[in-house]
């Protein structure tokens, strides 16, 4: 379902834990990390789509979270042609998104990456609030910055979270489909190093070293990074 300008209605999800860290998921079989997101089906409200995607992608139910806030308007990004399937090029332009900020009311063990037959992620971690800006694929970065900045106003009562993307960052070990495992630690990768680790066709986004987890399955170079 596209609007007249070629944008697909979509929801994005920023899930917080008790420390105001955000859920950060590794796309299955790839080196790329992102927030949960997905299209709004015909007849769905953004909130209904958010709860559906929340369960499909990370296995959580409405009782496991509470809504803290959402963006006021649609946030748009265009997708480069190399990430668009050939049959829809010329019609599909990108995504327009409503972003939801959720607070985890359940426990980490409530997160299930295999809740459906078509999982989106094969590992996940809690990351500091602004870390995704350093790791997300470039064409999504402006939307991530707009969403994180707009929704950060709901964090003003929680001084542990820097209210700018230039604060101190950190990360915890990542959780795989079958448990927890830590990635290499150390300084963040330079852009040159990140480029070397990306897939040859440029379809992968590479996190910093503190966020890196080896894929559990072979890397796919045919999937779009724009689900």
Curated annotation (Swiss-Prot):
It is an enzyme of class 3 (hydrolase). PROSITE patterns: NUDIX (PS51462), NUDIX_BOX (PS00893). It comes from the Bacteria. Residues 6-149 form the Nudix hydrolase domain. Pfam families: NUDIX (PF00293). Residues 192-201 have a biased composition (Low complexity). Residues 165-227 are annotated as: Disordered. One of its GO terms (molecular function) is pyrophosphatase activity. NCBIfam families: PRK00714.1-2 (NF001935), PRK00714.1-4 (NF001937), PRK00714.1-5 (NF001938). HAMAP family: Nudix_RppH. This is RNA pyrophosphohydrolase.
């Amino acid at each position: 379902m596209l609007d007249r300008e070629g944008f697909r209605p979509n929801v994005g999800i920023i899930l917080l834990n008790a420390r105001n860290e955000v859920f950060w998921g590794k796309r299955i079989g790839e080196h790329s990390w992102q927030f949960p997101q997905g299209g709004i089906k015909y007849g769905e409200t953004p909130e209904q789509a958010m709860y559906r995607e929340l369960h499909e992608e990370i296995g959580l139910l409405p009782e496991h979270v509470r809504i803290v806030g959402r963006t006021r308007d649609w946030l748009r990004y265009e997708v480069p042609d190399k990430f668009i399937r050939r049959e829809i090029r010329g019609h599909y332009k990108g995504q327009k998104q409503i972003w939801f900020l959720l607070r985890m009311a359940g426990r980490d063990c409530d997160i299930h990456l295999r809740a459906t037959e078509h999982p989106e992620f094969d590992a996940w971690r809690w990351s500091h609030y602004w870390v995704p800006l350093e790791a997300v694929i470039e064409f999504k970065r402006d939307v991530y910055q707009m969403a994180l900045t707009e929704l950060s106003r709901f964090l003003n009562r929680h001084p542990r979270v820097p209210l700018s993307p230039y604060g101190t960052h950190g990360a915890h070990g990542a959780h795989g489909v079958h448990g927890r495992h830590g990635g290499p630690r150390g300084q963040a990768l330079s852009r040159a190093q990140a480029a070397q680790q990306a897939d040859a066709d440029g379809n992968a986004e590479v996190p910093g070293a503190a966020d890196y987890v080896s894929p559990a399955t072979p890397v796919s170079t045919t999937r779009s990074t724009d689900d």
